[in-house]
């Protein structure tokens, strides 16, 4: 518990102070955000706001985690290092995307195909390592499993390695892009991430307290077959603290944006937590806001293509997608949209944690 508190607190402090430094440096270097022309006109005033603040979130998380390891004297675990690799790797893809936008002074960075290739490489490396036998512990358990998981592994569904790698890629790509789509209003994705990563911190703490590796329980419905749950909680706490510190400067009116560097990194780390904690399907509930944002874009594209094919004129389901911009176009103030979407996130997190705990209680 000391490592969790220290890691989260140190990450918060580094992020809070580091973001202020980043704002000054990025402003001096001219690392400003370019705004899409088809978005709400009110967003044009944000052009030039420093971006790539995700660099600070990533740095604060890494410092927070390893600082906690120094305090406790414990060695880093394979699961935590894999999660940090995913955070940094997906963040690097976002960094390249942001840098292209800044250097070319346009709202389009990496092309979709190039971005997906980058995410695919990171996801496959993560997947192969997390399933590899040489990272198994003395109980023969690898960081990731070959089962589909909800609250825990669904034991009767064992998948071939190729299928598992495909699912890992899908979860990482979908979650990264989901957080990326949500990051369109001041503080929206950051605040939502605080709640979801905070929820995963508590999930990991509970899994550690009921861990099959230390409780001696032989009932699979009362303990959790998860690798290194306490160390995953330290990383989740560090990310939560880093997002809290960044939110101080990212809240409306934002003094800095996280950019694709931050949104892809947070999405990748969130997917990694779901995979490593064996709660992939639970992520759909906990990260309900990110799912909603992604589905709104999918419905918008599908509706436009279908109506264009049928009538010759494409029609849109929403005024603009993702859906948070739709409500802006309806006349909602930006802060109103953000707070109400945070409320949605809070409801999703409460529902997800409730389902998680209820499943354990039902097994008693």
From Swiss-Prot:
Query: Which enzyme type, at the first EC level?
Result: transferase
Q: What are the UniProt keywords, alphabetically?
A: Cell cycle, Cell division, Cell membrane, Cell shape, Cell wall biogenesis/degradation, Magnesium, Membrane, Metal-binding, Peptidoglycan synthesis, Transferase, Transmembrane, Transmembrane helix
What is the protein's membrane topology class? Answer: Multi-pass membrane protein
InterPro entries per the UniProt record, alphabetical:
Glycosyl_transferase_4, PNAcMuramoyl-5peptid_Trfase, PNAcMuramoyl-5peptid_Trfase_CS
Q: Mind telling me which NCBIfam families this protein's record contains?
A: mraY
What does the similarity note say? Belongs to the glycosyltransferase 4 family. MraY subfamily.
Q: Which HAMAP family match?
A: MraY
Task: Report the protein name in the record.
Answer: Phospho-N-acetylmuramoyl-pentapeptide-transferase
Source organism per UniProt: Nocardioides sp. (strain ATCC BAA-499 / JS614)
Print the organism lineage: Bacteria, Bacillati, Actinomycetota, Actinomycetes, Propionibacteriales
């Amino acid at each position: 518990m000391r490592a969790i508190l220290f890691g989260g607190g140190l990450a918060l402090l580094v992020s809070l102070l580091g973001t202020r430094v980043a704002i000054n440096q990025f402003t001096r270097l001219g690392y400003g955000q370019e705004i899409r022309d088809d978005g709400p006109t009110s967003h044009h005033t944000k052009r030039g706001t420093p971006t790539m603040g995700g660099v600070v979130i990533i740095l604060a998380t890494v410092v927070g985690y390893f600082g906690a390891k120094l305090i406790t004297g414990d060695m880093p675990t394979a699961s935590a290092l894999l999660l940090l690799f995913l955070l940094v790797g997906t963040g690097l893809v976002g960094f390249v995307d942001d840098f292209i936008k800044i250097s070319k002074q346009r709202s389009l960075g990496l092309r979709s195909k190039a971005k997906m290739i980058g995410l695919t490489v990171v996801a496959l490396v993560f997947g192969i390592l997390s399933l590899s036998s040489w990272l198994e512990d003395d109980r023969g358990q690898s960081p990731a499993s070959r089962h589909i998981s909800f609250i825990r592994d669904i034991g009767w569904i064992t998948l071939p390695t190729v299928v598992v790698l495909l699912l890992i890629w899908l979860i990482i790509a979908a979650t990264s892009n989901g957080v990326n789509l949500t990051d369109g209003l001041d503080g929206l994705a950051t605040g939502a991430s605080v709640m979801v990563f905070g929820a995963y911190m508590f999930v990991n703490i509970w899994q550690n307290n009921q861990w099959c590796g230390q409780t001696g329980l032989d009932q699979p419905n009362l303990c959790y077959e998860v690798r290194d749950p306490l160390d995953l909680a330290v990383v989740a706490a560090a990310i939560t603290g880093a997002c809290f510190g960044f939110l101080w400067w990212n809240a409306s009116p934002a003094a800095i944006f996280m950019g694709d560097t931050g949104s892809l990194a947070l999405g990748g780390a969130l997917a990694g937590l779901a995979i490593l904690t064996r709660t992939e399907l639970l992520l759909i509930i906990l990260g309900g806001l990110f799912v909603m944002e992604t589905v709104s874009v999918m419905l918008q594209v599908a509706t436009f293509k279908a109506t264009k094919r049928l009538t010759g004129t494409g029609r849109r389901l929403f005024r603009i997608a993702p859906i948070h911009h739709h409500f802006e176009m309806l006349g909602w103030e930006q802060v109103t949209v953000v707070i109400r979407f945070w409320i949605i996130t809070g409801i999703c997190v409460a529902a997800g944690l409730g389902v998680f705990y209820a499943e354990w209680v039902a097994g008693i």
